Amino acid sequence: NNSSSKNGADFIIEHADIRRTLLNMKSIIEGERALCFWLSQQTEVSLNHPDEKTRQEASDYVSLMTPVVKSLFTDLAMEITSDAMQIHGGYGYTKDQGIEQLYRDNRITPIYEGTNSVQASDLVFRKLSNKNGNIINKFLDQVKSECKTDNEKIKPFLSEFNKNLDTLKKFSDWMTDKAKTEKDDVSAGANDYLKTLGYVSIAYAWIKVLEVSFKDYEENKNFYNDKIDTARFYFDKVLPRAEHHYKSAISGSSNIMNFKFN
């Protein structure tokens, strides 16, 4: 309900920043779920498909994306839980509200399995270089080939998506090249790379959601309108983070490694 309260004060839902925060939470969570469904499908293919080559390809994708799901998703869980607390103001910090318990419960998740930095290192030093970089390149090629359409309604989303996909390709090539001579650059940029891969992969999952949403739109307009509007927020407000992480990483590691700690 977006109407004002009876005493003349605005409900918090009428404030643009509250709405932004809620949509940030919603667009990330729903995109993560869609990507997890895709990853679960790849797991099934890797185990049960009759063709050996197809099984191996799916297994490679699961291996590539596992650090992303473990690391980025738990980092975002902390961001989202913190935002949920923030929306409630001081009351969100109290025990009887419940969000502070969720925050404390979630805080361990980025530390599980060797911490998220270890997941990022595993991605860039092992998964990215595996099979001479063929896995990431094959993944990018498959995504690009799948994300083509004559649907005019999806094309604006694809335009933004393809720009970020190109950024991910440049980032992957940069990391692969630096791994040969400048391992500090790779290590310093590992978290940034993982996040870029993650945000672009979530966008890929949203493209798949949009394809269904526009195809089946007449069957449930309210439901699919919600999906389309949520995807639009993700592409406008969240996906640009991918470019930011790329620019941060390619600045290198010299400042980091030369800094004198007391």
Predicted regions and their residues:
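C-terminal amphipathic alpha-helical interaction region
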Residues: 130, 146-262
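Acidic/histidine-rich catalytic neighborhood
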Residues: 4-53, 94-113, 117-118, 123-130
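Short amphipathic alpha-helical segments with heptad-repeat character
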Residues: 23-26, 67, 74, 162
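Short glycine/serine- and small hydrophobic-enriched flexible loop segments
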Residues: 41, 82, 125-126, 205-211
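Amphipathic, well-packed alpha-helical segments that form the structural scaffold of globular domains
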Residues: 37-40, 44, 78-85, 144, ...
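Glycine-rich cofactor-pocket loops
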Residues: 1-25, 41-62, 147-159, 175-191, ...
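Alpha-helix capping/hinge segments and adjacent helical runs
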Residues: 38, 60-138, 233-256, 261
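Aromatic- and histidine-enriched alpha-helix N-cap/loop-to-helix transition segments
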Residues: 27-34, 72-75, 194-201
